[in-house]
Amino acid sequence: MGIVLKKGQKVDLTKGNASLKKVIIGLGWDVNKYDGGHDFDLDAVAFCCGEDGKVHNEADMIFYNNLKHSSGAVEHLGDNLTGDGDGDDEQILIDLSSIPQHINKIDFTVTIHEAEERKQNFGQVSNSYVRVVNSDTKEELIKYDLGEDFSIETAIVVAELYRNGSEWKFNAIGSGFEGGLAALCKNFGLNV
């Protein structure tokens, strides 16, 4: 088992681990059982940002409709429509050695699909986590449990990978947003 982080903690990912080239960002959650008439569909989204914290264009947003960055460095491994089952619900593969120089950080977020229409929010989601796994060895390097701090939010910035010189660090963020995917897009410089 790797390092367990709390909200706001940062840790070196590649410093002292020069052989680490590919990691899997695993995101998981459970939906509290309630009869709202609709299934929950949570979606992982990665925003590949420049120094200003914004994406350059829509191609820097990796999600169920754009599964792979043009550089090949960031790849969403598929949309889980129900969140059922144990383990990671969605995964994003990161090739650290292929990330273009203009990308200084990658923010990992989770949104609830059609949250407003379905009257759903993160207060109805539990056991949320993000973890970083060495893609080659399958060793879990880092885990951050988000806890139960959310109520009316429909989107969360879970964590980020960011450049620190020639190294990569991981930051446990856990910041909630109202307004779902549209609010996140605006936050990262996209107009939808």
Swiss-Prot record:
Not known; could confer methyl methane sulfonate (MMS), mitomycin C (MC), and UV resistance. Pfam families: TerD. Gene3D superfamilies: sav2460 like domains. Belongs to the CAPAB/TerDEXZ family. This is Chemical-damaging agent resistance protein C. CDD domains: TerD_like.
